[in-house]
């Protein structure tokens, strides 16, 4: 279970965004976070995935703090994928960070990429030609597919998706959400997501958490 236990956080000491806030997400749950813009949904996502530390309280996985080293069992997919990758690395090297290939792959079915992971890349629509490109040579939708593949390839216990498809066309949105939900269901992983689409939330969420008030 992923848990935020009595957390307090604020960018200003006098104006906490969260004070004594708690949330539990069970394995297999798909939880949508709902709140007005600027309320702190992204901040909560960053805390749940270990990128921010609360001023008080704890973020726990099965009762233990998130690991500070190695691959984190809670993976986050950001709204702006260009902020989540090294601009100096080709995409095959970016995938290799998650154990997908050896950093030199020129095709999705390269011998260095395990068949199961190659299948994931294909389902996300990642093309051979993209593997040797740098992030700035890809569109936002193309780059986001790599970020999702990198997160899922680590077989996380939980995935945190912060408005990951907001800037994508409808066809790409449908494809990546289908793959993401299929993967978390297959592994009984939990999913926490933020989306401003009521239709998407209704289709995917098993629970909606209202953060306001």
Label the model's feature ranges.
Residues 34-36:
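The feature captures the beta-strand-to-loop junction immediately N-terminal to the Walker
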Residues 57-70:
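Conserved ABC transporter NBD signature motif
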Residues 80, 87-104:
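Q-loop/switch helix immediately C-terminal to the Walker
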């Amino acid at each position: 279970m992923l848990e935020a236990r009595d957390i307090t956080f604020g960018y200003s000491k006098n104006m906490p965004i969260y004070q004594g806030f708690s949330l539990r997400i069970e394995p297999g749950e798909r939880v949508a976070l709902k709140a007005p813009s600027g309320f702190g949904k992204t901040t909560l996502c960053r805390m749940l995935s270990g990128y921010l530390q609360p001023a008080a309280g704890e973020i726990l996985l099965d009762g233990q703090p998130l690991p500070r080293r190695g691959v984190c069992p809670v993976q986050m997919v950001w709204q702006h994928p260009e902020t989540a990758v090294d601009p100096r690395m080709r995409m095959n090297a970016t995938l290799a960070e998650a154990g997908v290939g050896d950093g030199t792959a020129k095709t999705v079915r390269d011998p260095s990429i395990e068949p199961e992971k190659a299948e994931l890349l294909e389902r996300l629509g990642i093309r051979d030609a993209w593997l040797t490109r740098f992030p700035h040579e890809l569109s936002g939708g193309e780059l986001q597919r790599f970020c999702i593949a990198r997160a899922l390839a680590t077989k996380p216990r939980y995935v945190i998706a912060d408005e990951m498809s907001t800037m994508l066309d409808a066809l790409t949105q449908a494809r990546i959400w289908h793959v993401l939900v299929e993967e978390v269901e297959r592994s009984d992983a939990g999913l926490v997501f933020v989306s401003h689409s009521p239709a998407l939330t209704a289709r995917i969420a098993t629970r909606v958490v209202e953060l306001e008030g």
